[in-house]
From Swiss-Prot:
A GO CC annotation given for this chain: cytosol
Keyword Transcription regulation: no
Species name: Thermotoga sp. (strain RQ2)
Chain's role: Catalyzes the attachment of glutamate to tRNA(Glu) in a two-step reaction: glutamate is first activated by ATP to form Glu-AMP and then transferred to the acceptor end of tRNA(Glu).
Entry protein name: Glutamate--tRNA ligase 2
Record field: catalytic activity: tRNA(Glu) + L-glutamate + ATP = L-glutamyl-tRNA(Glu) + AMP + diphosphate
PROSITE patterns in the record: AA_TRNA_LIGASE_I
PANTHER family: GLUTAMATE--TRNA LIGASE, GLUTAMATE--TRNA LIGASE, MITOCHONDRIAL-RELATED
Enzyme nomenclature, EC number: 6.1.1.17
Length: 469
């Protein structure tokens, strides 16, 4: 059975790059009738925060990427928090030491740093070996460690050989002998390094495929060597392309919003974000672009992942969001849009009126946060607009003639035509002025939609105010 995992570190909000990785894993698991596992890699004690764990899970749920096993739902391969698995890592490190594949190091971190700087100053690569650390392994140093309650670090003996990775996306990648030296797998604070914890977890959780960003490609050499040391076949690797900003540089905060939470707060829909992220580094067999989650699952395959960097285009995401927004049932749209109106200080009293406003304005909106300003004039009088002198009589007469008319465009339009003809006013100039009087804006939805919805009382009041009444 296919078993994949998404393993974020709770050091910040869920980045769109991480969300895309989670999405590809989720789609592959669902397509192959496998399991999608959430594992929290929280061994970086200084940067990990419980608050971010909750936020990460909240963002994944919002996107609809629900996991089969994880910290909150449990499973047969837990615990799913690395901080709760420390004893497991120690046992596996000790096993490697016993088998002669790893060794204890009694050097302090600053001594190791000194060695590193010395090697660099001599123009050598900072590669470590067991012989280099032997001078620190003395009875005095061991006693010191014991008295201070410290544990020796554990270093893995890197075999001197080539390793070959057959990556689903990158193809054959050869790691040459001597690319790296021995490396630390357990620190002196008793915590595992990323690569070691990752391999132990993937091994014990029976992960079959590792789908992750290609910034992890450099970690793969160490991981392949560790799988070999544990006499386990590595999973299938698929390193997906980097996401770049429109300027061709790695996507970062300088490009604007980059976290799922930020896009949600701006009024993007999960359907749109999922659809858009799926197309960053993957393509539909028939070139389709607008795809539901179900359609993405049924058409997803690893062989359509591209090795080329993907460009994050905010305008395309916005266009896609507009499509989903306009095609959403009005009840759902009203429910999602309401908080944005409240935040903008607009109180919704009449639900049916609110839905009609959304129907009229949604063609001009691409994200939920644009609704309040696009439709504020339906809820509040705009600042009075001065009517040009030559049109004051037109508006005064209209105000009188429309008092007793039934409020439908079928009844209102003939009155407009009659009054304009009497005064010889061009319709274009009149309607532009009328729009400004009613909405305070130069453009917006069609007046034939605005006028009936505003109602007679508001229509006449706004004309009265602009006439200086």
């Amino acid at each position: 059975m296919v078993r994949v995992r998404f393993a974020p570190s709770p050091t910040g909000f869920l980045h769109v790059g991480g969300a895309r990785t989670a999405l590809f894993n989720f789609l592959f698991a669902r397509k192959e009738k496998g399991k999608f596992i959430l594992r929290i890699e929280d061994t970086d004690l200084e940067r990990s925060e419980r608050e971010y764990e909750e936020k990460l899970m909240e963002s994944l749920r919002w996107l609809g990427l629900l996991w089969d096993e994880g910290p909150d739902v449990g499973g047969d391969h837990g615990p799913y928090m690395q901080s709760e698995r420390v004893e497991i890592y120690r046992e596996h490190a000790e096993r490697l030491v016993k088998e002669g594949k790893a060794y204890y190091v009694y050097a302090y971190p600053e001594e190791i740093e000194e060695m590193r700087e010395k090697l660099l100053s001599e123009g050598k690569a900072p590669h470590y070996s067991q012989e280099m650390f032997e001078k620190f392994d003395t009875p005095e140093r061991r006693r010191e460690y014991e008295e201070k309650g410290l544990r020796p670090a554990v270093f893995f003996k890197m075999p001197r050989k080539d390793y070959v990775l057959n990556d689903v996306v990158k193809g054959e990648v050869v790691f040459k002998t001597g690319a790296i030296g021995d490396f630390v797998i357990m620190r002196s604070n008793g915590l595992p390094t990323y690569n070691f914890a990752c391999v132990v977890d993937d091994m014990l959780m029976e992960i079959t495929h590792v789908i992750r960003g290609d910034d992890h490609l450099s970690n793969t050499l160490r991981q392949l060597a560790l799988y070999e040391a544990f006499e386990k076949a590595p999973p299938v690797f698929a390193h997906v392309s980097t996401i770049l900003g429109p300027d061709g540089k790695k996507l970062s905060k300088r490009h604007g919003a980059t976290s799922v939470e930020a896009f949600r707060d701006m009024g993007y829909l999960p359907e749109a974000l999922v659809n858009y992220l799926a197309l960053l580094g993957w393509s539909h067999p028939e070139g389709k672009e607008l795809l539901t989650l179900e359609e993405l699952i049924s058409s997803f395959s690893l062989d359509r992942l591209s090795p080329n960097p993907a460009i994050f285009d905010p305008q395309k995401l916005k266009w896609m969001n507009g499509y989903y927004l306009r095609n959403m049932p009005i009840e759902k749209l009203a429910e999602l849009a309401k908080p944005f109106f409240e935040k903008a200080g607009i109180k919704i009293i009449d639900e049916e009126y609110f839905k009609k406003v959304l129907e009229i304005t949604k063609e001009r909106v691409e994200v939920l946060s644009e609704f309040p300003e696009e439709s504020r004039f339906f809820f509040e009088d705009p600042a009075p607009v001065e009517i040009p002198e030559e049109m004051k009589e037109v508006f005064s007469q209209l105000k009188e003639e429309l008092q007793n008319v039934r409020w439908t465009m079928e009844e209102i339009t003939p009155v407009f035509k009659k009054v304009l003809k009497q005064h010889g006013v061009k319709p274009k100039e009149f309607y532009m002025t009328l729009r400004r009087v009613l909405t305070g804006r130069e453009e917006g939805p069609e007046l034939v939609n605005i006028i009936p919805l505003l109602g007679k009382e508001i229509f006449l009041r706004r004309i009265e105010r602009s006439l200086g009444g």
